[in-house]
A protein has these predicted regions:
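Well-ordered mid-protein domain cores that form the structural environment of catalytic cofactors
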Residues: 1-21
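Extended C-terminal regions of large enzymes
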Residues: 15-18, 22-52, 58-516
């Protein structure tokens, strides 16, 4: 009785059936049922466990939903007061920390205009890093806050227009209450964050903030990853503009840069696998291979994962991380270049400087370089982010740079909860262990070093704006790869972990999997 129904409806129905409005529901939406490659596992109707297509895995197993209810049993902790001592002072600090307060007010969408000003806002399927100041402002965080959030009419959006994950004081989630062309955008759908606004906005050269909010709603209702969905729409538009597909292919939809109605129509067909949408539902990489005739050159993805809205052309360490990351291009697998510059470390020694030093990073690098010092930064922050994933904590609360709390505080919380002394060094080892296990899994499945590469478009000069002419330097990129393999303890020929690396991490049991 739940198959084929939208996520909001399924969640409400299941909560009513178990008699608990506070019950949480994990589910695949209709897109997961239809095995859309980038279907996500949804919770709270508007939270997506995105990327990698886990919603399609649920759909393939005919598993529609899992309902979880809390009990009255208190969580046992070794040192509850130790946890409080670390966490409670952070709550009033939210307003005092400019980085975190902007996140609380605008969500991640608060960075869209600055990304554009730096020439780092992917535009027209990564052909440019700039869509103009006025057009970026039209889809940015300040406008969303002032006009689209619930409560904006009464100037009460700080209270009514934000949501939070359980027990979080930052409250970075948006609640949009608006319309697009007479179609209601339900507050239950949340609201667009930076990635979603970029992929349905600048990627497609669209500056209609209401259309973007509606696209976000569709993705949440059908249960898909917004990055993959929006980037695939941009790929399709690019193909149409280049004459690789026509309205005959798209079922009469005349795609084009800046055409919001056509983009929404194509998205709807993709989420339901109708017509040409069935091709796009495989994601841009498979769609490009299917179309051929040069369409492959318009795909902007690594290991099948579409690139997020952080550009390696202006954040060089991401060129490396996107390439080597086991599940493809991901912007939340390491810290970004602007957070490790000599100027920033000098200006903020007590925050950025200390948190870098906690990871053993004492040689800050200019934003634009990709040298050995930057590779070390990328690798060590990759270990830190990997550890945070292992601990299942939010990367907007804990982290190695701008976040509310640093890795030292995370180690302290884990120590207080478990009673087992944990240091930052321990966390980096845990992160390295996870990363090497992921890499070994890929190797067993036949994914080789040849997949540690970047799409053709990143090596082509950007067009327009502050980043005009910039491109990933292929020689510099290849040299950084070699340095990374050496620092990570991976074989430079196969790209796989060396036997001694696995042994040092307590992963010797994986050696037979890699024929070591």
């Amino acid at each position: 009785h739940l198959w084929g129904r939208l996520t909001h409806d399924v969640e409400t129905t299941l909560q009513e059936e178990v008699g608990d409005r506070r019950a949480h529901v994990l589910q695949c939406g209709p897109a997961g049922e239809k095995l859309v490659r980038f279907a996500a596992i949804m919770n709270m109707s508007n939270r997506a466990n995105g990327r990698t297509g886990m919603g399609a895995v649920m759909g393939s197993k005919k598993l529609k939903a899992i309902v979880v209810r809390g009990g009255k049993r208190k969580l046992a902790m070794a040192d509850p007061e130790g946890v409080r001592a670390i966490m409670q002072p952070s709550i009033p600090a939210i307003r005092e920390d400019e980085d975190v307060w902007d996140l609380a007010k605008h969500g991640t969408l608060g960075i869209l205009e600055s990304q554009n000003a730096n020439g780092g806002l992917p535009t027209r399927n990564y052909q440019s890093g700039w869509m103009g100041y006025d057009r970026a402002a039209a889809i940015g965080g300040e406008r969303l806050f002032n006009e689209l959030l619930r409560g904006a009419d009464e100037d009460d959006q700080m209270k009514l227009g934000r949501e939070t994950c359980y027990s979080c004081a930052v409250r970075c989630k948006r609640v949009v209450d608006a319309e697009w062309q007479g179609r209601k955008i339900d507050p239950k759908s949340g609201g667009q964050e930076y990635e979603t606004a970029s992929v349905f906005g600048s990627y497609c050269d669209i500056d209609d903030i209401h259309a973007i909010a509606y696209a976000n709603q569709l993705c949440n209702q059908y249960g898909v990853d917004t990055i993959a969905a929006g980037a695939t729409m941009a790929f399709a538009i690019n193909c149409y503009e280049e004459g690789l597909i026509t309205s005959h292919d798209t079922g009469g939809i005349e795609l084009g840069w800046g055409q919001a109605e056509a983009m929404i129509a194509m998205l709807e067909k993709t989420l339901s696998r109708q017509g040409f949408g069935d091709v796009l539902a495989e994601g841009s990489a498979r769609a490009g291979a299917h179309l051929g005739n040069g369409a492959e050159d318009l795909v902007v993805a690594v290991k099948g994962a579409e690139l997020p809205a952080h550009m390696p052309q202006v954040k060089p360490s991401l060129a490396l991380i996107y390439a080597v990351n086991p599940f493809g291009a991901d912007h939340q697998s390491s810290e970004h270049d602007p957070n490790y510059t000599p100027e920033l470390i000098a200006d903020s020694p007590e925050k950025y400087g200390k948190r870098a030093a906690d990871l053993g990073l004492t040689n800050p690098q200019p934003e634009e370089v990709l040298n050995a010092g930057k590779v070390e930064y990328a690798l060590k922050t990759q270990y830190a982010y990997s550890a945070m994933d292992t601990a299942d904590v939010c990367q907007f609360v804990f982290g190695p740079a701008w976040q509310l709390l640093g890795m030292e505080e995370l180690a302290g919380v884990i120590t207080a909860v478990t009673g087992e002394k944990t240091t930052v060094a321990d966390l980096l080892t845990i992160g390295a262990r996870r990363l090497n296990m992921l890499r070994a899994f890929n190797a067993r499945e036949g994914i080789t070093r040849e997949r540690d590469t970047l799409p053709k478009r990143l090596f082509e000069p950007l067009d327009g704006g502050p980043s005009h002419g910039k491109a990933v330097d292929r020689v510099e990129f290849e040299a950084a790869l070699e340095t990374y393999y050496e620092m990570a303890g991976w074989d430079p020929v196969s790209g796989n972990p060396r036997a001694e690396t696995l042994e040092a991490l307590g992963l010797g049991w994986l050696k037979p999997e890699l024929a070591l």
